[in-house]
Amino acid sequence: MIDTVYGFGQGLMGGIWPATVWPVLWALIKIVCVLLPLMGCVAYLTLWERKAIGFTQIRFGPNRVGPFGLLQPIADALKLLTKEIIMPTAASKGLFVLGPIMTIMPALAAWAVIPFGPDIALSNINAGLLFLMAITSMEVYGVIIAGWASNSKYAFLGAMRASAQMVSYEIAMGFCLVVVLMVSASLNMTDIVMSQAKGIAVGYGLNFLSWNWLPLLPIFVVYFISGLAETNRHPFDVVEGESEIVAGHMVEYSGMAFAMFFLAEYANMWLVAILAVILFLGGWLSPVDWWLFNLIPGWIWLGAKTFVVVTMFLWVRATFPRFRYDQIMRLGWKIFIPVTLVWLVVVGAWMQTPYNIWK
């Protein structure tokens, strides 16, 4: 279908514009078609978070703006758009502006290689997983720059905490991705999903038992918890601990500059969740080979699984207390990294035996 639309547009525009115009215009259309729904999901994730936490605390959550509070994200966006951006007198102005930009850009650029179906992706490159590992590691620079440029000891302390935490858990997440790379034998995101469509359980119609979450369960657990820490989500949110340093590296920001950090955090939540679905939960594949399930489009399965993973993020926030900073560092360096290294060796040895299930 996408190829049909592209061919139609090329034929329509070919006689009007030079041949190089339509590919550029088509790329812009695809970017808009990904970013606009993403921004909508980010906005309404804030509402779902407040509603879900309200449910766990036996209260309603936002219910005043629009029916059932459905217009609350729009009201929040308008509030942030109309607020003044105040720059501290002693701040480094260029870096102060650059910090939020460098934080949100990797969170958006990473979606370029995320497949929403077998043939639905902005760029279906063979090194998609490598691109993701590289681009997401750039976000830590925005955090450091924001803390340094604010010329505030509170912002600087928050930036040091955030950067140390992000770097620590990036290592464990990187090893998790390497294990998935080993069993899939590909860096292509689509190939990783399709590699989960084969196995003994598939022959019995139980597709979900052939996905990577089961044989790589320890890696899946480490990835999920590391994703919480990487995005500075509860219970790893010491960066913006309300009782300590308020908003961490964002403490001197206001208006849309603050909103860009906010958007980056929630866009990263969606990114970590959809990556968990693609790498471990079969992506757009149906969990059971049943004719009724097979009628459901793959992108709906992908969205439903991603929504469940994101909801698990919110459930963790509603139920667990915040860890101390030393506990977070100990968990990352003394538990997660050794576990992923050991499992990397175990899976490598497993693949060399006659019991290799990933052939």
From Swiss-Prot:
Catalyzed reaction equations: a quinone + NADH + 5 H(+)(in) = a quinol + NAD(+) + 4 H(+)(out)
Record keywords, A-Z: Cell inner membrane, Cell membrane, Membrane, NAD, Quinone, Translocase, Transmembrane, Transmembrane helix, Ubiquinone
EC number: 7.1.1.-
Record bears the keyword Cell inner membrane: yes
Regions that span the bilayer: 16-36, 94-114, 129-149, 167-187, 208-228, 261-281, 296-316, 331-351
Annotated InterPro entries: NADH_UbQ_OxRdtase_su1/FPO, NADH_UbQ_OxRdtase_su1_CS
One GO term (biological process): aerobic respiration
First-level EC class: translocase
GO molecular function, one term: quinone binding
Gene Ontology CC terms: plasma membrane
Pfam families per record: NADHdh (PF00146)
Membrane topology per record: Multi-pass membrane protein
Subcellular location: Cell inner membrane
Keyword NAD: yes
Role noted for this protein: NDH-1 shuttles electrons from NADH, via FMN and iron-sulfur (Fe-S) centers, to quinones in the respiratory chain. The immediate electron acceptor for the enzyme in this species is believed to be ubiquinone. Couples the redox reaction to proton translocation (for every two electrons transferred, four hydrogen ions are translocated across the cytoplasmic membrane), and thus conserves the redox energy in a proton gradient. This subunit may bind ubiquinone.
Family of the protein in this entry: Belongs to the complex I subunit 1 family.
Assembly: NDH-1 is composed of 14 different subunits. Subunits NuoA, H, J, K, L, M, N constitute the membrane sector of the complex.
Name this polypeptide is given: NADH-quinone oxidoreductase subunit H
Organism, scientific name: Polaromonas sp. (strain JS666 / ATCC BAA-500)
